[in-house]
């Protein structure tokens, strides 16, 4: 064998010892490098496992958050839909009440015999003139007082009519602003919620892609 031949050809035992020492040193150095490489690979595997675990946990957390946000948005949408339906129903109710109040006002004005009040006053006045020509001074005073009382009653009825008209007008004026929505979600608000939800989903996808790139980079480092 070449090794035995080399030993047999050595000048002295010292050279062989030196050779064996160098061989042992080289072997130990090689073993140390191998151990360092294996340690580095274990560290990389640990880091990769930690990264994968962190990524999995992050994905799970994001999914929980997205599910909670989606549930919250769905509840908000249901609440807004219910509010919108309620407002629509209130609007229809106010419209019906406004129309009813308007019809009642028109009917009241039509049925209120304002012209007959003037005619009645004229009849009383003509009757007074006729009575003045036929009655004594005391009777005339009595008729005058009666006419004055009738005139006062007509003025009271006139004021009552004016108050009723003012009340109906005030009621109509109060109903008109109430028809305008005071709460609930407009199209702009619903669109804003949709954009926010879309942004959260896009952000989650971006984070997922970033983690995937980190994973591919770690795999590439392990394969080299």
Curated annotation (Swiss-Prot):
One of its GO terms (biological process) is synaptonemal complex assembly. Interacts with gras-1. Interacts with brc-1 and brd-1. Keywords: Chromosome, Coiled coil, Meiosis. Its main location: nucleus. This is Synaptonemal complex protein 3. Plays a role in early meiotic events; during prophase I contributes to synaptonemal complex (SC) assembly, synapsis and chiasmata formation and stabilization of homologous chromosomes pairing. Required for restricting SC assembly to bridge paired chromosome axes. Required for the timely progression of meiotic crossover recombination. Required for the synapsis checkpoint. Residues 63-97, 137-171 form a coiled coil. GO terms for cellular component: central element; chromosome; lateral element; synaptonemal complex. Disruption phenotype: Elevated levels of embryonic lethality and increased frequency of male progeny. Chromosome segregation defects. Lack of syp-1 and syp-2 proteins in meiotic nuclei. Impaired homologous chromosome pairing. Lack of chiasmata. Increased levels of germ cell apoptosis. It comes from Caenorhabditis elegans. It is found in: Chromosome.
